[in-house]
Amino acid sequence: MKRGFTLVEVLVAMAILVVVLAVGVRYFASTSELARNTQARSELQDRVRMVMQVVTADLQMAGARYWNSGNQNQAFSLPLPPLSGSNMGPKDTLTLYYVTSLRDLASACRRVDYGFEGDTLRRSDVNATPSSGSDCTTPPPNSQPLAEGMLALDIQYQCSDGSRKDTPDCGTDAYPRSAKVTVAGYSLTSVTNPGPASLTTVTGKTLACPQGRACYALTQEVLMPNLKPLPTP
């Protein structure tokens, strides 16, 4: 003879169902949180790497004077100094000039600037090519946001006389041969277990990570061969 479920059996089944649902909700919430944290950290690392790639490429080009395309060649004179900057703690500024063959002759001379507005790193890249002659001009910068959530663009310059400087000015008897660059930033959203509370830059500056944000830093050395003075005849 068939019989229905007793009240006790129904209550037990409901209790089991509630436990299973609670475990499922907790699992999916944990998975979603893990995905958000992973995405935030990945975006942070990609952003810092992008800034490092752009900055080191510009530094490597600083002082380049020649434009070449096929059989066409053009030498330009750059404003002096072709690389200048200020030591602003961990947020340095830069102004540099170079000639690139990746653009046509009418826009080969470039003026590039870096500076901060709060925690936003801004970059300017403007055409400094003269309408006639071979002397690159000094146009005003036109800064655009490059990356948000940046703690540092800290640069230490290795001079040809062996000294280390926090600005590109190595004096009259030396030139900046290379630069060690620290780029640091923080995640744009909060994460669980954010990691270290502070970071240290190449010049020894301590960076405090914002509460609840992951921080990430890269330090890289870049050679600047175009800044070596041309031999005098």
UniProtKB/Swiss-Prot annotation:
Protein name: Pilin-like protein PilA3
Phenotype caused by lack of the gene: Mutants have a wild-type piliation phenotype but are deficient in transformation.
Biological classification of the source: Bacteria, Thermotogati, Deinococcota, Deinococci, Thermales
Pfam families: N_methyl
Region Disordered: start-end pairs: 121-143
Keyword check for Membrane: yes
Transmembrane segments: 5-25
Entry's localization field: Cell inner membrane; Cell outer membrane; Periplasm
Membrane topology: Single-pass membrane protein
Keywords, sorted A to Z: Cell inner membrane, Cell membrane, Cell outer membrane, Membrane, Methylation, Periplasm, Transmembrane, Transmembrane helix
Function: Plays an essential role in natural DNA transformation but is not required for pilus biogenesis.
Modified residues (N-methylphenylalanine): 5
Gene Ontology CC entries for this record: cell outer membrane; periplasmic space; plasma membrane
Residue ranges annotated as propeptide in the record: 1-4
Record field: compositional bias (Polar residues): 126-137
Alphabetical list of InterPro entries matching this protein: N_methyl_site, Pilin-like
